[in-house]
Amino acid sequence: MTENHYLLLTPGPLTTTKSVKEVMIYDWCTWDDEYNTMVQEVRAKLVSLATKEEEKYTTVLMQGSGTFSVEAVIGSVIPANGKILVCTNGAYGKRIVQMAEMLQIDVVVSQTEEWEPTNIVEVEKLLQEDKEITHIAVVHCETTTGIINPIVDVCKLGKQYGKVTIVDAMSSFGGIEIDIADLQIDFLISSANKCIQGVPGFGFVIAKRDELLKCKGQGRSLSLDLYDQWETMEKQNGKWRFTSPTHVVHAFYQALLELQKEGGVRARYNRYYNNQKLLVNRMGEIGFKPLVDEEYQAPIITSFIYPKQGFEFQQLYNELKRYGFVIYPGKISKVDTFGIGNIG
């Protein structure tokens, strides 16, 4: 097997440490007590990263990509008579809308341009006009562009109007400090292969216990039933209902230890932030402009606008890959861009 020397300048999967890779050499049994104890430690560590009020929250691990965990939340927490307001300004907000529609859940959309943050004024207007809305969902860092959405304001509004709050923090959790109790987030979703710097294979939901308990019997899918998954893990000491990605869990546990060793989320944020600023400055020197205004830019990934003349993305991609760097193609619908990630 050829050793991979590429540095992934992407928003996840990303470049992992040698020590994270090495723990995946060994095989583990899903029924083993030592393994299940590790699962419980992972669940507890995630809650402690998310809030100081740990007793109010719990973690559910879910096999698959981060999208599986998002769909588990959408399909499990909204009752048959519920309605969700989705704030969208990119591919991942739109994906939540698609999920709701596929699951035949009533959905209202607050949409802004991909380079603009969620419009709080419009969100409040929709909440005032539509009393049937029960839940509100927003993407924290929209990976499409690297824009940060105002989750503090969105969640505050949500609670002001008595709604359940859902935050897709796929590309921000572990890289940007968040206290979900302070922000009044009921369900936060992220993935193993993002800012905590593990490998792909499972996502996780950090849920307010009181709200999660209301989800019993509401799941619209067997394998993506969030409550049933939690209940099994809770009552059977970390057991998953179906085969779990044992190697990925071990890699994630190691990645959590390395996050702690680095100095925690604040230290990691500072590293990402400094790298992102350096990247934008150096790219600016050779004529590349970022899509998102600095005020709304996350340190996770930066979208750069194609120069108007003489630019071929595939040529840039191939040349960078030849030198050992892999970047991210653009996913913007109205503007030609490419992305460079700072995580990993």
UniProtKB/Swiss-Prot annotation:
Keyword Transferase carried by entry: yes
GO biological process: organic phosphonate catabolic process
Catalytic activity: (2-aminoethyl)phosphonate + pyruvate = phosphonoacetaldehyde + L-alanine
S-S bonds: none
Signal peptide range: none
Keyword annotations from UniProtKB, A to Z: Aminotransferase, Pyridoxal phosphate, Pyruvate, Transferase
Enzyme's top EC category: transferase
Cofactor section: pyridoxal 5'-phosphate
Family annotation (InterPro entries): Aminotrans_V_dom (IPR000192), NH2EtPonate_pyrv_transaminase (IPR012703), PyrdxlP-dep_Trfase (IPR015424), PyrdxlP-dep_Trfase_major (IPR015421), PyrdxlP-dep_Trfase_small (IPR015422), SP_NH2Trfase/AEP_transaminase (IPR024169)
The enzyme's E.C. designation: 2.6.1.37
One MF annotation (Gene Ontology) recorded for this entry: 2-aminoethylphosphonate-pyruvate transaminase activity
N6-(pyridoxal phosphate)lysine sites (modified residues): 194
Superkingdom of the source species: Bacteria
SUPFAM superfamilies per record: PLP-dependent transferases (SSF53383)
Family from the record: Belongs to the class-V pyridoxal-phosphate-dependent aminotransferase family. PhnW subfamily.
HAMAP family: PhnW_aminotrans_5 (MF_01376)
Subunit composition and interactions: Homodimer.
UniProt function note: Involved in phosphonate degradation.
Name of the protein described by the UniProt record: 2-aminoethylphosphonate--pyruvate transaminase
